[in-house]
């Protein structure tokens, strides 16, 4: 990692320094490090950027020295949400590093796609076309390339997108609004058609997500049920994204399919971990906390780590805390939400 990311900076805001120290300290409880990360993410994502933006980005990037694949993948996600070109170099370094965990590299590629800068295209295309790379890396780079091309296209300017309840920058935008809106069954058909480009299928996924929020929307349960079918897709990347979307939605109708995914010991760790964290966001639903506790000693490290974070999130949901974050005494309270 570049020295600017790991060296102790001088003249940096005390709050950022405090959060950074917690984030990079391997002796700190993982849940506390996650809360520090989400506090830094809030600062790094402020628009317009402030004098704290770059130090917050550098503080997040400093965490890539961690031994936790779960934490590193979340760092990459947070950097991808900043809309800031200063995050690009850190993500490029991670995605090119074949010694990094595949889950972390995938999230770095996705983050580059979310940032949308065409300077990342050459690296992403090379990884997409490299037959020696793992499927999850190639597929993520494929979607990221398509998203960057879309972001910088004339087509994007002419598309009318349905306003979303979610502020996240997604791997793909929802399908554009048309004179006659596609039915949930039409979107489900696109979602599950493995012959279509992943980018197009992701667009259907996020269109379905937006039809499931708020939870009392008449289309919500049907949209959740359609999305749940994606958890049987042959692509692990695709399955993990469905679980992530369920974590955003926090809809009780997703609990059975998420529980089934987490319980499947043959499922890939990156999918099970996402199911665990999604269940954590549903911590106020009866039985969810007990389900999570069953996997505290799971054989897979990333799943065990996710359970720790998920139980912390579940506690936050039950207690109705204002923000899932670690706000030092010197910082003014800010509404910070988990990714």
UniProtKB/Swiss-Prot annotation:
Q: Which organism is it from?
A: Aspergillus oryzae (strain ATCC 42149 / RIB 40)
Q: Name one GO cellular component term.
A: cytoplasm
- Annotated region (Disordered) at 159-183
**What protein does this entry describe?**
Deoxyhypusine hydroxylase
Q: Report disulfide bridges, numbered on this chain.
A: none
Q: Where are the HEAT-like PBS-type repeats?
A: 71-97, 104-130, 200-233, 238-264, 271-298
> According to its UniProt record, where is this protein located?
Cytoplasm; Nucleus
* A GO MF label: deoxyhypusine monooxygenase activity
Q: Which domain of life is it from?
A: Eukaryota
């Amino acid at each position: 990692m570049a020295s600017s990311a790991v060296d102790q900076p001088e003249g940096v805001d005390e709050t950022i320094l405090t959060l950074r120290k917690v984030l990079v300290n391997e002796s700190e409880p993982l849940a506390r490090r996650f809360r520090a990360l989400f506090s830094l993410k809030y600062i790094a994502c402020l628009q317009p950027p402030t004098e704290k933006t770059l130090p917050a980005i550098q503080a997040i990037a400093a965490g890539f020295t961690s031994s936790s694949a779960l934490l590193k993948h979340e760092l990459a996600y947070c950097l991808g949400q900043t809309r800031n070109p200063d995050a690009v170099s850190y993500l490029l370094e991670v995605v090119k590093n074949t010694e990094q965990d595949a889950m972390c590299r995938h999230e770095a590629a996705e983050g580059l796609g979310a940032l949308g800068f065409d300077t990342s295209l050459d690296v992403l295309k090379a990884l997409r076309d490299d037959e020696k790379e793992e499927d999850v890396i190639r597929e993520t780079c494929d979607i990221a390339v398509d998203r960057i091309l879309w972001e910088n296209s004339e087509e994007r300017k002419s598309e009318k997108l349905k306003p979303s309840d979610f502020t996240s920058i997604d791997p793909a935008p929802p399908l554009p609004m048309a004179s006659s809106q596609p039915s949930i069954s039409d979107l489900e058909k696109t979602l599950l058609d493995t012959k279509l480009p992943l980018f197009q299928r992701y667009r259907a996924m996020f269109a379905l997500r937006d039809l499931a929020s708020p939870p009392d929307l008449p289309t919500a349960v049907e949209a959740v049920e359609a999305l749940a079918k994606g958890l049987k897709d042959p692509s692990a990347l695709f399955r993990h994204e469905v679980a992530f979307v369920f974590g955003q939605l926090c809809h009780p109708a997703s609990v059975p399919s998420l529980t089934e995914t987490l319980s499947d010991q043959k499922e890939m760790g990156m999918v099970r971990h996402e199911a665990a964290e999604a269940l954590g966001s549903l911590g106020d639903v009866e039985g969810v906390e007990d389900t999570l506790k069953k996997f505290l000693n799971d054989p897979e490290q990333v799943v065990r780590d996710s359970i720790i974070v998920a139980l912390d999130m579940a506690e936050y949901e039950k207690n109705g805390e204002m923000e899932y974050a670690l706000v030092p005494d010197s910082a003014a309270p800010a509404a910070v939400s988990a990714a």
